[in-house]
């Protein structure tokens, strides 16, 4: 009997494969996105030194104050806007988008488009 892998296991395998293909540098850091059932998280990471330069999530007071729910497309867009604004304040203009093995649709796409509209290039 062949058992089917869970969605989480498949997503983690995809993410590992993607991470082998690219990494963030000081000139072009990585915008890593994680989606849980209740929240969205985004970090801009310099992989050469292993440090998070900028982060934002639906748990931040700045983001949470303007949201009714934290697990919808509007919340993801708000996180994208905030992470882009914080990155531009630190002088980060271009990033590599790491969708974390998630399908590029819905909340993942909304976060990316909001970050682009706010001024990040990827």
UniProtKB/Swiss-Prot annotation:
Annotated InterPro entries: Ribosomal_uL18_bac-type, Ribosomal_uL18_bac/euk
Superkingdom of origin organism: Bacteria
GO BP of this protein: translation
Keyword Protein transport: no
GO molecular function, one term: 5S rRNA binding
Keywords of this entry: Ribonucleoprotein, Ribosomal protein, RNA-binding, rRNA-binding
Entry GO terms, CC: cytosolic large ribosomal subunit
Gene3D superfamilies: 3.30.420.100
NCBIfam families, A to Z: L18_bact
Assembly and oligomerization: Part of the 50S ribosomal subunit; part of the 5S rRNA/L5/L18/L25 subcomplex. Contacts the 5S and 23S rRNAs.
Recorded family membership: Belongs to the universal ribosomal protein uL18 family.
UniProt cross-references to PANTHER family, sorted A to Z: 39S RIBOSOMAL PROTEIN L18, MITOCHONDRIAL (PTHR12899), LARGE RIBOSOMAL SUBUNIT PROTEIN UL18M (PTHR12899:SF3)
Known role: This is one of the proteins that bind and probably mediate the attachment of the 5S RNA into the large ribosomal subunit, where it forms part of the central protuberance.
Protein name as catalogued: Large ribosomal subunit protein uL18
Organism of derivation: Lachnospira eligens (strain ATCC 27750 / DSM 3376 / VPI C15-48 / C15-B4)
